[in-house]
């Protein structure tokens, strides 16, 4: 059982105290429903070697290390491979390099310098396997709660968390919609790689705003297109082979949407075209990746003939 009492204690005396009281029961109800592969993934977690890191780096990457032999490293490799595919990372765990599909460290190097997370209570919506949560702690966050309903990501987070049990990071297998309305308890809320999967983008912005304290900061990272404030791409069907992509606005359009949703001090801090070096198939993620989803003769287009992935990071205040 995952004991959330440290989280409840951490949130005592904060605007999130009332919410925290029901989290253990909510988590256990979700675990009761479970997932068909959950037992297999739990088996992988249980086979991880029992180690205590003597070196922890969450600032320049995500690296844990200690003195261990080749047999222990082989055990670590096999257990972590049992939690494949690994999407976000990379992770360096006791001499095992988990070369994930995404070079999420590249994204963090673009986003992180624009943020002040020192002492902040942070929510990461659609947190994946928690890679960014650890980097947020490395940047000085007081505590980080991630929410993502994907059970594999939940188990991948537990794989790292079992070696860092004292650190104030928690992964809850919940969707944003399962959080109460008007939570208003986080200093910083992240939504990275989620917005374009939402059928109702303004509703998503309002839900994110609901999670923030007054004056809190939103970090929004999403797919965009080039154009003016009236330009928005709605794919006819798939986008880069993804069925669940709905709205790709231009940066000026997205800035307008944020202002319309009641945010202020809206500004874009980064726009980057995603390269096949940043997102690709690896030993740890053997399925198709970005290179398979782009026009082989023109990487400026997807296989559907739409503009290739371009991602922007915007900051805004409640």
Swiss-Prot record:
Class of enzymatic activity (EC top level): transferase
Top-rank taxon: Bacteria
Keywords: Transferase, tRNA processing
Amino acids binding carboxy-S-adenosyl-L-methionine: 88, 102, 107, 126, 176-177, 192, 196, 311
Listed transmembrane segments: none
Enzyme Commission numbers on file: 2.5.1.-
MF terms (GO), sorted A to Z: methyltransferase activity; transferase activity, transferring alkyl or aryl (other than methyl) groups
UniProt-listed InterPro entries: CmoB, Mo5U34_MeTrfas-like, SAM-dependent_MTases_sf
One Pfam family of this chain: Methyltransf_9
Catalytically driven reaction(s): carboxy-S-adenosyl-L-methionine + 5-hydroxyuridine(34) in tRNA = 5-carboxymethoxyuridine(34) in tRNA + S-adenosyl-L-homocysteine + H(+)
GO BP field: tRNA wobble uridine modification
Subunit structure comment from the entry: Homotetramer.
Family: Belongs to the class I-like SAM-binding methyltransferase superfamily. CmoB family.
Purpose: Catalyzes carboxymethyl transfer from carboxy-S-adenosyl-L-methionine (Cx-SAM) to 5-hydroxyuridine (ho5U) to form 5-carboxymethoxyuridine (cmo5U) at position 34 in tRNAs.
Protein name (record): tRNA U34 carboxymethyltransferase
Organism: Pseudomonas entomophila (strain L48)
Upper lineage: Bacteria, Pseudomonadati, Pseudomonadota, Gammaproteobacteria, Pseudomonadales
């Amino acid at each position: 059982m995952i004991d959330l009492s440290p989280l409840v204690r951490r949130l005592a005396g904060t605007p999130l105290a009332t919410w925290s009281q029901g989290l253990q029961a909510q988590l256990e109800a979700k675990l009761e429903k479970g997932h068909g592969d959950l037992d297999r993934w739990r088996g992988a977690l249980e086979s991880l070697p029992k180690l205590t890191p003597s070196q922890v780096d969450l600032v320049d990457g995500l690296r844990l290390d200690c003195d261990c032999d080749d047999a222990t490293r082989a055990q670590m490799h096999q257990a972590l491979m049992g939690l494949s595919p690994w999407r976000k990372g990379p992770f360096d765990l006791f001499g095992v390099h988990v070369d994930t599909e995404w070079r999420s460290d590249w994204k963090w190097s673009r986003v992180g310098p624009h943020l002040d997370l020192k002492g902040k209570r942070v929510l990461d919506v659609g947190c994946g396997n928690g890679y960014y949560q650890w980097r947020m702690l490395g940047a000085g966050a007081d505590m980080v709660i991630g929410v993502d309903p994907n059970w594999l990501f939940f188990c991948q987070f537990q794989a790292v968390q079992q070696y860092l049990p004292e650190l104030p990071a928690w992964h809850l297998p919940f969707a944003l919609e399962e959080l109460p309305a008007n939570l208003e308890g986080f200093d910083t809320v992240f939504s990275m790689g989620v917005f374009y999967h939402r059928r109702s983008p303004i509703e998503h912005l309002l839900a994110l705003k609901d999670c923030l304290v007054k004056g809190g900061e939103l970090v929004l990272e999403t797919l965009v297109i080039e154009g003016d404030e009236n330009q928005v791409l709605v794919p006819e069907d798939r986008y880069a082979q993804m069925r669940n992509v709905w709205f790709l606005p231009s940066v000026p359009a997205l800035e307008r949407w944020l202002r319309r949703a009641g945010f202020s001090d809206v500004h874009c801090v980064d726009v980057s075209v995603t390269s096949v070096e940043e997102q690709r198939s690896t030993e740890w993620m053997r399925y198709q990746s970005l290179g398979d989803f782009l026009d082989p003769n023109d990487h400026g287009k997807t296989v559907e003939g739409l503009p290739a992935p371009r991602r922007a990071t915007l900051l805004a205040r409640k």
